């Protein structure tokens, strides 16, 4: 076999379909977010505004977070020095897990190197804990959940997105004595729509199923203390296992689960993705704990309120220009383009001509024909930056002769 030719063919196919991913070289500057510096391919630097970042609230540069990280770095050095089982558990890791369990009203929490690993490791391990377990998964669950469920050596059922009636049919068709788990999300990041948490919890109660809720795009963002959509809706006590990230609203790095002490102890003891990997650096754990604690306060609520206001303003202004907004009421602002080449071209022109960075979202992240630009306004985007973005989108939409409409489903 000609291995080089096979690789060239695989990459060439992505180029032909307009979905080859390019990395934009940007450098965030302390105290200036959402502004950053883009280093062009020729080495020149251009000041830009980031409109697609996951640092939803700007906590990655908050003084409280940076101070905690500096203190831990000066006290302990760079790395943790080992796995959690072998010299890699510190007071900073324990403090972080205490903040997380408190955030979700659970007995315990467990920190992983990322939310992807937390999902993959936890979901793939559950068969060891519950022989005969059947997992019911929303068809639009994140790739990390899908991978974990694929590696789960047990029965799997996929229900149509947010379709509670279909989920009921699947649950009712299986052995009532079989252990069951329903895996779903509170906010689906590509469309920005909410999962029907209460309705799924009602079904879980009826069919004696565990609930597994991914709140990656909601923790820090919703609820009076940033505990996510389940906290906002008063449903945290009905969720058996939470998954979340430390790298979005909390602005740092890492992932976690929160659950009962028994559940966390079992995952800690059986999940290879937790056991056989170096733990988070103490400075990262310290920064994440400080961020979580801050976002539980009234000051944290002010950031959430401003972020929601900015998201509403951006949606209103883009919709007023006929942009096909996909608005499900969350903080995420997707604009439907529907063509990978156009989507990439819009992204490139926004960056090169207007200093606006938003990454195109193409297949396989979203289905073919639903390609989009996905904006994530933060509380630190100011009115001038919003105005500049709206005018740029208006100009390029006309230049590219794209259709305008009042809404998009």
From Swiss-Prot:
Pathway info: Porphyrin-containing compound metabolism; protoporphyrin-IX biosynthesis; 5-aminolevulinate from glycine: step 1/1
CDD domains registered for this protein in UniProt: KBL_like
Catalytic function, reaction form: succinyl-CoA + glycine + H(+) = 5-aminolevulinate + CO2 + CoA
EC number: 2.3.1.37
Residues with N6-(pyridoxal phosphate)lysine modification: 248
InterPro entries for the chain: 4pyrrol_synth_NH2levulA_synth (IPR010961), Aminotrans_II_pyridoxalP_BS (IPR001917), Aminotransferase_I/II_large (IPR004839), AON_synthase_class-II (IPR050087), PyrdxlP-dep_Trfase (IPR015424), PyrdxlP-dep_Trfase_major (IPR015421), PyrdxlP-dep_Trfase_small (IPR015422)
Keywords attached to this entry: Acyltransferase, Heme biosynthesis, Pyridoxal phosphate, Transferase
Keyword set includes Acyltransferase: yes
Positions with a binding annotation for substrate: 21, 137, 156, 365
Positions with a binding annotation for pyridoxal 5'-phosphate: 189, 217, 245, 277-278
Assembly description: Homodimer.
The name this protein goes by in its record: 5-aminolevulinate synthase
Organism: Paracoccus denitrificans (strain Pd 1222)
């Amino acid at each position: 076999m000609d291995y080089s030719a096979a690789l060239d063919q695989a990459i060439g196919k992505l180029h032909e379909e307009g979905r080859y991913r390019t990395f934009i070289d940007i450098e965030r500057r302390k105290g200036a977010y959402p502004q950053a510096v883009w280093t062009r391919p020729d080495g020149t630097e251009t000041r830009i505004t980031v409109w697609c970042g996951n640092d939803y609230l700007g906590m990655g540069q908050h003084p409280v977070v940076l101070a905690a990280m500096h203190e831990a770095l000066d006290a302990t050095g760079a790395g943790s020095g080992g796995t959690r089982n072998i010299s890699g558990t510190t007071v900073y890791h324990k403090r972080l897990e205490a903040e997380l369990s408190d955030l979700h009203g659970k007995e315990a929490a467990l920190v992983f190197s990322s939310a992807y690993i937390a999902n993959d490791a936890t979901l793939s391990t559950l068969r060891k804990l519950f022989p005969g377990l059947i997992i019911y998964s929303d068809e639009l669950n994140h790739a990390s959940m899908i991978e974990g469920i694929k590696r789960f050596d047990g029965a799997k059922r996929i229900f149509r997105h947010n379709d509670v009636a279909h989920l009921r049919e699947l649950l009712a068709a299986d052995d009532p004595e079989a252990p069951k788990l329903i895996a779903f999300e509170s906010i689906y990041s590509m469309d920005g729509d909410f999962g029907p948490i209460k309705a799924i919890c009602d079904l879980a109660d009826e069919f004696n199923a565990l609930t597994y809720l991914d709140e990656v795009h909601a923790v820090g963002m919703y609820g009076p203390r940033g505990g996510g959509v389940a906290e906002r809706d008063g449903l945290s006590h009905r969720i058996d296992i939470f998954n979340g990230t430390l790298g979005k609203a909390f602005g740092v790095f890492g992932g976690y689960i929160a659950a009962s002490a028994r559940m966390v102890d079992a995952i800690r003891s059986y999940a290879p993705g937790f056991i056989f990997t170096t733990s988070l650096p103490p400075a990262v754990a310290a920064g994440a704990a400080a961020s979580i604690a801050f976002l539980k306060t009234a000051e944290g609520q002010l950031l959430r309120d401003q972020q929601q206001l900015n998201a509403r303003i951006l949606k209103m202004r883009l919709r007023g220009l006929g942009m096909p907004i996909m608005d499900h009421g969350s903080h995420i602002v997707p604009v439907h383009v529907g063509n990978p080449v156009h989507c990439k071209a819009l992204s490139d022109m926004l960056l090169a001509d207007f200093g606006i960075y938003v990454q195109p979202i193409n297949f396989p992240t979203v289905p073919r024909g639903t390609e989009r630009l996905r904006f994530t306004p933060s509380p630190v985007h100011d009115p001038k930056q919003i105005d500049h973005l709206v005018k740029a989108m208006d100009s390029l939409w006309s230049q590219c002769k794209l259709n305008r409409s009042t809404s998009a489903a």
